[in-house]
């Protein structure tokens, strides 16, 4: 079999297809590179691994530098990934070739599936996906959430909260770090913050005022989750988790439920974000609407 000519013809056809069918070019790229990867895999088994380098030299000369040895090896990796996972090209969650290039170095199957789903559902660019992988997003999920994802069980709002939350300090001096600074850093990159506590969030207000008796209290951050149809109270603490923090946030949650929430919305939830966890405090928290996580400064 003349593997080289077949590979070359697939790549030429793909380039021509992209010029007239721009809408479907990402899918066609993936299928073309998968088929090239399959041929490279078979050629390597027949002639040895060095054949890939030989093919790349010829392809660079005839079709351009984009088909160098490194790229061809990625195509071969793509085929091996599909083969190993026993995916059909039709049923696999097809994201872009660029996104697959970000995922190829990952070895863990559960992690691969997580990032593929993330890219597919959120229409992530390669740059955005790279950022999420680099932040070790999967590793920051709870073991309970990972098990749910593996067994395809439904996840709830708590399952999507990462631990720890990474807060960008923008290289500012944090010698005298306090809750006000923590809130400021979060607000400066609110989109990244909301991504780390799940999806479907909309920002309402910081320092949200509520009147308790004759005195105003202020909620650090008030969000709304469109997917779960509920308000979300966020309280920020720069210390270890304490029992009084739970009492405080429950008071705010109850206020929202009584005075703001409509009848067709779910009960308000609360998330305490603190410097250090204390599992013993949460053991005696009877309210399953209260969650906690920690933060680290980047």
Model feature map: region roles:
Residues 1-298:
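Basic, low-complexity intrinsically disordered segments
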């Amino acid at each position: 079999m003349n593997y080289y000519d077949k590979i070359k013809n697939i790549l030429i056809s793909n380039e021509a297809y992209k010029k007239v069918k721009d809408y479907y070019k990402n899918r066609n790229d993936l299928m073309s590179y998968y088929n090239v990867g399959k041929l490279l895999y078979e050629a390597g088994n027949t002639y040895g691994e060095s054949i890939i380098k030989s093919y790349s030299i010829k392809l660079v000369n005839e079709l351009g530098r984009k088909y160098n040895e490194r790229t061809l090896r990625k195509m071969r990796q793509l085929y091996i990934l599909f083969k190993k996972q026993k995916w059909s090209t039709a049923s696999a969650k097809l994201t872009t070739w660029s996104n697959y290039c970000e995922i190829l170095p990952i070895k863990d199957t559960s992690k691969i599936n997580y990032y593929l789903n993330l890219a597919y559902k959120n229409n992530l660019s390669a740059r955005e996906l790279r950022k999420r992988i680099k932040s070790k997003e999967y590793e920051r999920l709870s073991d309970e959430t990972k098990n749910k994802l593996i067994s395809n069980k439904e996840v709830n709002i708590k399952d999507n909260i990462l631990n720890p939350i990474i807060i960008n300090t923008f290289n500012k001096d944090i010698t005298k770090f306090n809750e006000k600074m923590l809130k400021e850093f979060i607000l400066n990159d609110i989109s990244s913050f909301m991504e780390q506590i799940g999806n479907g969030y909309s920002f309402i207000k910081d320092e949200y005022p509520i009147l308790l008796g004759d005195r105003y209290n202020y909620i650090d951050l008030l969000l709304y989750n469109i997917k779960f149809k509920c308000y979300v109270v966020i309280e920020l603490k720069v210390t270890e988790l304490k029992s009084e923090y739970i009492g405080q946030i429950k008071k705010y949650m109850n206020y929202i439920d009584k005075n703001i929430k409509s009848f067709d919305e779910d009960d308000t939830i609360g998330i305490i974000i603190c410097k250090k966890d204390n599992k013993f405090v949460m053991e005696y928290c009877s309210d399953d609407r209260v969650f906690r996580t920690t933060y680290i400064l980047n």
